[in-house]
Amino acid sequence: MHGQKNISERYQKFKEMEGTGKIVCVTGGAGYLASWLIMRLLERGYSVRTTVRSDPKFREDVSHLKALPEATEKLQIFEADLENPESFDDAINGCVGVFLVAQGMNFAEEYTLEKIIKTCVEGTLRILQSCLKSKTVKKVVYTSSADAAMMISNLKAVKEIDETIWSEVDNFISKPEQVIPGLPSYVVSKVLTERACLKFSEEHGLDVVTILPPLVVGPFITPHPPPSVSIALSIISGDVSMMLGVRLENAVHIDDVALAHIFVFECEKAKGRHICSSVDFPMHDLPKFISENYPEFNVPTDLLKDIEEQEPVHLSSDKLLSMGFQFKYDFAEIFGDAIRCAKEKGFL
């Protein structure tokens, strides 16, 4: 398995200071993907401004960001919140690029359509207005989700999902006051916000591209295991309840998806949506993998025997690959790196 040092060694060519002298903004910097993305941007020579939530109720630990090499010289941390989009102005002004990674919703909560539109859609659009107003931002990368393409009624009959497919959310958006449960509300927020971003791009001439990752797994620099890693590793404790509401059949390594964000930002050919998924696997392969490679956890190979086994739907990253991007990590590394990191940090 690859430790963080070995992961970094893979990218000597990557670290050619492409971003030297350039300033970019990453929203939601305390999170899993954003913190890893910040680490890679700093390595590439960029100066980074990142935002964390300003609400005292959601005070975020940023010690892992401050501990990054070159953070003292090249990382600035701003307080901002999607419910107050103007608070992003100072962080964005002077940047050449913005990575909209912050997630304005709690996966476990319920939301009305009105709340989703006000916080996620309108908040994001006002941030895009800030990008226009800055006169310096050349490109914006919005982190959507594969869920914005995979929630369709005939999914079992579909062999492949690509960027032309959008999740079907009409049933959830007929009434503004309608309460939408956790996972569907997340999907609705991603679909509506991504569509709004791309429409804004067309109408205002601001270059906006989107990334659609599935479950993101791998090592982490956050103080605690991220939700996606916790879901993937919950199988070790025998608690499969966390897995049942998640499509655990497509995944991508945290390093690959972070580098894909940088790739589409730097690639002039990148336009529109980009699915970023490296492996499709039957859910039942995960307990088998852990049982065979980590026998100390005593995970039964038939742990998911009560869940119907079926072939995964292929989540196609052909568009991203056709532009020259390459995935570096396979199934064993995606989950093996997560286990190794969790063990090293004392969570397993």
From Swiss-Prot:
Transmembrane segments: none
UniProt GO molecular function: oxidoreductase activity, acting on the CH-OH group of donors, NAD or NADP as acceptor
Pathway membership, UniProt: Alkaloid biosynthesis
Documented EC number(s): 1.1.1.415
One of the Pfam families matching this protein, by short name: Epimerase
InterPro entries in UniProt: Epimerase_deHydtase, NAD(P)-bd_dom_sf, NAD(P)_dehydrat-like
Keyword field contains Iron-sulfur: no
Domain of life the protein comes from: Eukaryota
Top EC category: oxidoreductase
Catalysed reactions, as listed in the record: narcotine hemiacetal + NAD(+) = noscapine + NADH + H(+)
An individual GO BP term: alkaloid metabolic process
Function: Oxidoreductase that catalyzes the last step in the biosynthesis of the benzylisoquinoline alkaloid noscapine. Converts narcotine hemiacetal to noscapine.
Family (UniProt): Belongs to the NAD(P)-dependent epimerase/dehydratase family.
Entries under PANTHER family matching the protein: CINNAMOYL-COA REDUCTASE 16, NAD DEPENDENT EPIMERASE/DEHYDRATASE
Protein name as it appears in the record: Noscapine synthase SDR1
Natural source organism: Papaver somniferum (Opium poppy)
Gene name as annotated: SDR1
